[in-house]
């Protein structure tokens, strides 16, 4: 019988892709993938080491899964990822129950190390690995959606960020290799590609021939079967007009852009080495809104950066009120050892960070409610995920401006659709993050397919839906 392996992934979508590559490598080597750690002889934990809370979550997961070595079938526990790249020796001392620690440059070696009784316990080479279309990969999301990692590493030197030390410098994948992987995913049923990298807009700057992101996007849009292409982690420093035009003019690129801006205070932008000032950021946002009507912007902000005064924070609060982002996440600054920001004076107390985060979110929640209410009565395309987790009487899906895993859902309370099908939905109700609607149109070829009955939502109920309360 094949040895069973379970993968536990923490952190960002880029980490998910790394886990999928390791799963593919293990599956190709003959391992059987399972969803229950209690059934696995081998457990792999792919960690995050970006900020303190992520490190704590990773260690807790390792300790919890180590119980399977004492109580379950597990005979080998492997820990990989950013936390290992950063703290391998310390982890090895503190966690004797772990058999192997693999850094971010060793993902391709996981099957060899797991199967070799003589393999080293610590395998932490330079972080220079980047997978290709020829690398085995198992998509861990529902088959209709997948992440496509177009580059690895980062050449920026943001004062608060440890990622370049964990992931190495920018390494872009060639266009033909990315198109080949996109085509392979489409052949498995993928209709939505979410493009990810540490710095998406830096794509190609390290490749010969002056290749950039706006050259890649039209090629991906030609892949048969791909309906939606979504852009994440777009660094704002370099967004040329050609890229804006590609997003505006190509129908398969959804009008959604995830662009972490971090702050609006010029003083803090300089201190954090972001490379652009607030005038540039405002001009960029205005250019994007003007050139791409209906664009949904998601951003991430940091409160409590070293030296952030009340005046700096008020500037950020006004910026959020002014820009009215469709989606927004706020992080409390975490002082990371080895970064310039950790050595700066005037560190902000944790209580102040929390209070500032809460104030930003209170403002954003009102903005989100207004955006959501404006959706009522509109007809939008929705990618159906399947039955809602909350109740079998609803279907759950996402419209083009709802990204997987991080944004809200569109619940369907009237109509029929298959998972992976894109249907037209009329929005009838809205909450802070989620929407409700009814199916008003389907692709005739899908509606007539001789398959088992598609999931059907229950008719709309008067008085709204409990799932939105």
From Swiss-Prot:
Cofactor binding, per record: Binds 2 [4Fe-4S] clusters. One cluster is coordinated with 3 cysteines and an exchangeable S-adenosyl-L-methionine.
Residue sites binding [4Fe-4S] cluster 1 per the record: 12, 48, 82
Low complexity bias spans: 447-461
Gene3D superfamilies tied to this protein: Methylthiotransferase, N-terminal domain (3.40.50.12160), Nucleic acid-binding proteins (2.40.50.140), tm_1862 like domain (3.80.30.20)
GO MF, one example: aspartic acid methylthiotransferase activity
Subcellular location: Cytoplasm
Domain spans labelled MTTase N-terminal: 3-119
Catalytic reactions of this protein: L-aspartate(89)-[ribosomal protein uS12]-hydrogen + (sulfur carrier)-SH + AH2 + 2 S-adenosyl-L-methionine = 3-methylsulfanyl-L-aspartate(89)-[ribosomal protein uS12]-hydrogen + (sulfur carrier)-H + 5'-deoxyadenosine + L-methionine + A + S-adenosyl-L-homocysteine + 2 H(+)
Domain TRAM: start-end pairs: 373-441
Region (Disordered): 444-469
Cofactor(s) listed: [4Fe-4S] cluster
Biological process according to GO: tRNA modification
Record-stated family: Belongs to the methylthiotransferase family. RimO subfamily.
NCBIfam families: 30S ribosomal protein S12 methylthiotransferase RimO, MiaB/RimO family radical SAM methylthiotransferase
Protein name per its UniProtKB record: Ribosomal protein uS12 methylthiotransferase RimO
Species the sequence originates in: Anaeromyxobacter sp. (strain K)
């Amino acid at each position: 019988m094949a040895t069973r392996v379970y993968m536990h992934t923490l952190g960002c979508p880029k980490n998910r892709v790394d886990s999928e590559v390791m799963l593919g490598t293990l599956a190709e080597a003959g391992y059987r993938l399972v969803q229950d750690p209690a059934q696995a002889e081998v457990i792999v934990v792919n960690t995050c080491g970006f900020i303190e809370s992520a490190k704590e979550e990773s260690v807790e997961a390792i300790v919890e899964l180590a119980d399977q070595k004492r109580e379950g079938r597990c005979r080998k526990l492997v820990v990989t990822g950013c936390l290992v790249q950063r703290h391998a020796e310390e982890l090895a001392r503190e966690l004797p129950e772990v058999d192997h620690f693999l850094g971010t440059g060793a993902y391709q070696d996981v099957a060899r190390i797991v199967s070799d009784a003589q393999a080293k316990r610590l395998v932490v080479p330079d972080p220079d690995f980047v997978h290709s279309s020829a690398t085995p990969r198992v998509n861990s999301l529902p088959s209709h959606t997948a992440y496509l990692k177009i580059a690895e590493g980062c050449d920026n030197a943001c004062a608060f960020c440890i990622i370049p030390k964990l992931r190495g410098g920018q390494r872009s994948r060639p266009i033909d290799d990315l198109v080949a992987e996109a085509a392979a995913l489409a052949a498995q049923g993928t209709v939505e590609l979410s493009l990810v990298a540490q710095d998406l807009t830096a794509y190609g700057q390290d490749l010969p021939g002056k290749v950039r992101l706006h050259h890649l996007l039209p090629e991906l849009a030609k892949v048969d079967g791909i309906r939606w292409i979504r852009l994440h982690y777009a660094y704002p420093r370099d967004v040329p007009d050609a890229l804006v035009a590609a997003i505006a003019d190509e129908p398969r690129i959804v009008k959604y852009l995830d662009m972490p801006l971090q702050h609006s205070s010029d003083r803090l932008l300089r201190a954090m080495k972001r490379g652009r000032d607030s005038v540039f950021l405002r001009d960029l946002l205005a250019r994007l809104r003007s050139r791409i009507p209906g664009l949904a912007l998601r951003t991430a902000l940091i409160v409590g950066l070293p030296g952030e005064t009340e005046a700096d924070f008020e500037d950020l609060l006004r910026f959020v009120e002014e820009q009215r982002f469709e989606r927004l996440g706020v992080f409390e600054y975490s002082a990371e050892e080895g970064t310039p920001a950790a050595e700066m004076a005037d560190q902000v107390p944790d209580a102040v960070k929390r209070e500032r985060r809460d104030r930003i979110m209170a403002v954003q929640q009102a903005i989100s409610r207004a955006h959501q209410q404006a959706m009522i009565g509109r007809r939008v395309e929705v990618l159906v995920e399947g039955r809602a987790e909350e109740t079998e009487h609803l279907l759950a899906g996402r419209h083009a401006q709802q990204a997987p895993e991080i944004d809200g859902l569109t619940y369907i309370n009237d109509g029929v659709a298959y998972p992976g099908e894109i249907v037209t939905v009329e929005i009838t109700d809205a909450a802070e993050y989620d929407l409700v609607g009814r199916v008003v149109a389907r692709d005739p070829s899908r509606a007539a397919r001789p398959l088992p009955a598609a999931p059907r939502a229950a008719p709309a109920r008067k008085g709204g839906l409990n799932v939105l309360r």
